[in-house]
């Protein structure tokens, strides 16, 4: 598992998947937890993830809630890594959070995270995918641009985003815009 995670991180830094089969912009689906870390001990951080991943709790969590998890390195912004947890909908996220919170293995991983990262730098938020094009699961490199859209201006912002993406054609692989539904007062959307 450790070699696989390291391979994914390295290949993510070195490769680009620029084209996907469906580049038309459409309504998105899914609910996403973004967890931002400033990791000081990458090996210990990944080891904590591996220990949790090999637990019966992790198996139950994924099997029952459909949680899909990714670890990404990040450049800029004061955080070195993102853990992204994707769920099909809010009900599955709630089920996943309940299972995750009930396990000693997840508590042990969180303690290890505190020992391998700057805990006061940690933050998270939950988003819902508003618009998407292509299949982001096929990409290995992402931009994650966080923006604050003025309250009441989301429709015009989304229209401008559609115009931008329509004007670029197939220049991107996959892209989309997420609305932050809770967890962060500084960011209202993230563009990926």
Question: What would you call each of these model-derived segments?
Answer:
Residues 18-192:
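Short S/T/G/P-rich N-terminal loop/turn motif that feeds into the first structured element of a domain
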Residues 1-4:
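Positively charged n-region of N-terminal signal peptides that target proteins for export
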Residues 7-17:
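Bacterial N-terminal signal peptides
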């Amino acid at each position: 598992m450790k070699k696989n995670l390291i391979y994914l991180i390295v290949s993510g830094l070195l490769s680009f998947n620029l084209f996907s089969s469906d580049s038309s912009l459409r309504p998105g689906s899914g609910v996403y937890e973004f967890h931002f870390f400033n990791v000081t001990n990458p090996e210990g951080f990944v080891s904590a993830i591996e220990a949790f991943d090999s637990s019966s709790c992790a198996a139950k969590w994924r099997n029952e809630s459909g949680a899909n998890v990714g670890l990404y390195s990040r450049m800029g912004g004061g955080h070195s890594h993102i853990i992204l947890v994707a769920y099909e909908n809010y009900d599955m996220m709630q089920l996943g959070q309940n299972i995750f919170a009930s396990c000693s293995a997840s508590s042990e991983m969180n303690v290890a995270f505190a020992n391998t990262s700057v805990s006061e730098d940690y933050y998270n938020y939950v988003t819902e995918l508003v618009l998407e094009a292509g299949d982001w699961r096929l990409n290995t490199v992402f931009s994650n641009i966080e923006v604050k859209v003025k309250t009441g201006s989301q429709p015009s912002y989304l229209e401008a985003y559609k115009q931008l993406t329509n004007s670029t054609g197939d220049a991107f692989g996959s892209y989309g815009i997420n609305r932050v539904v809770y967890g962060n007062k500084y960011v209202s959307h993230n563009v990926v």
